[in-house]
From Swiss-Prot:
EC number from the UniProt entry: 5.4.99.25
A single GO BP: mRNA pseudouridine synthesis
Protein name: tRNA pseudouridine synthase B
Native species: Psychromonas ingrahamii (strain DSM 17664 / CCUG 51855 / 37)
UniProt-listed Gene3D superfamilies: Pseudouridine synthase, PUA domain
Species lineage: Bacteria, Pseudomonadati, Pseudomonadota, Gammaproteobacteria, Alteromonadales
């Protein structure tokens, strides 16, 4: 999702460490104001309860946010056993309370059922839409909508800690996976119920964990700029990652400046040896300046599908 408005034409991606108890959109708007960006969008919402990596795209980078939305994610989650809630997290109402009599062997066996390609029924408390309305709005009105199970992949699900009624897990999943649903399903498999009490996203695509910054750190840079009598953007803008990092996993096709002019006008070009059946990251000239993405068409030409307006 993107928001247009007055502001700077600044392009790039900031890896925000989202705090708990605010919505992803609220966090997005704060970052947009801090950078005074004319356009901003995030790359997949985190629940208000959750913290961690929320890539915020500014300016032309918003055109490529979908690629991050479609990327793999990694989370560390604490599941509290014995209590099931309406939302499958600690912010919901308690549905049931049951004794926890789970052994390590039982937990290992239950976790193993989630590994690999599985089908998952999305939570009613999700942003998936039914007739134009997100499911969570129906859920808050006590209305249950039938949802189809969707294929997901759990690449890894590793136990970090099992103490008392708490299980801490490190989970690496494909796009569209609901961690709260995994935890709820785990609780039912164990026969005691469970809900998410702590959730932190530690990775989106291949972005490094140590590049994340908090809202407080961004605001501190503004104060530092005031004290140093420099523009805050002199301190903020270096934190931005290049917009093409959103599509870094795709093969690069480097073309001449002349061919780049054709592509920027929406025209396909011929590039010998370019791979087909994949998204292509198009760069121009010796500097390998990123201008957008494309695909090979039926005529064997590289056709642009999304271009940056630089």
């Amino acid at each position: 999702m993107a928001r247009r408005g007055k502001g700077r034409s600044i392009n790039g991606i900031i890896l925000l460490d989202k705090p708990t108890d605010i919505s992803s959109n609220h966090a997005l708007q704060r970052v947009k104001r801090i950078f005074f960006a004319n356009k901003a969008g995030h790359t997949g919402a985190l629940d208000p309860l959750a913290t961690g990596m929320l890539p915020v795209c500014l300016g032309e980078a918003t055109k490529f946010s979908q690629f991050l939305l479609d990327s793999d994610k990694r989370y560390i989650v604490t599941a509290t056993l014995g209590v099931r809630t309406t939302t499958s997290d600690s912010q919901g109402d308690v549905v049931s309370e049951r004794p926890v009599e789970v052994t390590q062997t039982q937990l290992d066996q239950a976790l193993d059922t989630f590994r690999g390609d599985i089908m998952q029924v999305p939570s009613m408390f999700s942003a998936l839409k039914h007739k134009g309305q997100p499911l969570y709005k129906y859920a808050r009105e006590g209305i249950t909508i039938e949802r189809e199970a969707r294929p997901i992949t759990v690449y890894e699900i590793n136990q970090l800690r099992f103490e008392g009624n708490e299980v801490e897990l490190d989970i690496h999943v494909s796009k569209g996976t609901y961690i709260r649903t995994i935890v709820d399903d785990l609780g039912e498999l164990l026969g005691c119920g469970a809900h998410v009490s702590v959730l932190r996203r530690t990775q989106v695509a291949d972005y490094p964990y140590d590049k994340m910054v908090t809202i407080e750190q961004l605001e501190a840079l503004i104060e530092q700029a005031k004290e140093s009598d420099v523009s805050p953007y002199d301190l903020l803008d270096p934190l931005l990652l290049d917009m093409d990092t959103a599509v870094k996993k795709y093969p690069e096709v480097n073309i001449s400046d002349e061919m780049g002019e054709y592509v920027l006008h929406g025209q396909p070009v011929q590039v010998f040896g370019a791979p087909d059946n994949t998204v292509l990251r198009i760069t121009v000239g010796e500097a390998h300046t990123f201008i957008g993405v494309g695909k090979m068409n039926e005529a064997g030409l590289i056709a642009p599908t999304r271009l940056a307006n630089l």
